[in-house]
């Protein structure tokens, strides 16, 4: 739909103008929340908010469950993952959010997990998190037994329980990566909406992909190869 693509372009331009590398994490997180709400995740169907311990969640109001979990970091934070290094605090926090959501809240509706600083997005499939973390009974029980304790225990959970597990599986963790800054020079040009790379970005952020909703046959197949080539 050209109207949706044009709105996405317009909102992306606004987001990139408003994101500020020197601003605190909360400010940029708020801007991303607005971007999602104004584009493909309308408040009639979705609720996007901080949720207890999780930085940001997308909840599907129809099922009353979170479907996407976000961990945010300040731009250039030492705690942020990179393409070459996933053994970072941002990942430990995301794993903890996921375990609590899947095992304590019994929420099996999560589809994707995201680490972002506003510009960069590392998007992980829930199925992979389940295989590598959720199914690990020892990991889950250690987290659960430590979780209900004081805040200083949180660092213990990250460093002593989750970190070794992330170290062990880091080479098996695949993700889709996109840096919105690579679109910055083009978002003001109306013809960007015809470009395959822009359409791929649009689909990447859509409920069809992030929530794994069924989609019409005319959409390009949403596979990792497709995104890797375009983004």
What would you call each of these model-derived segments?
Residues 1-50, 199, 224-228:
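Charged, often low-complexity linker/regulatory segments
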Residues 54, 59-87, 93-231:
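Charged, often flexible domain-edge or linker segments that flank or initiate folded functional domains
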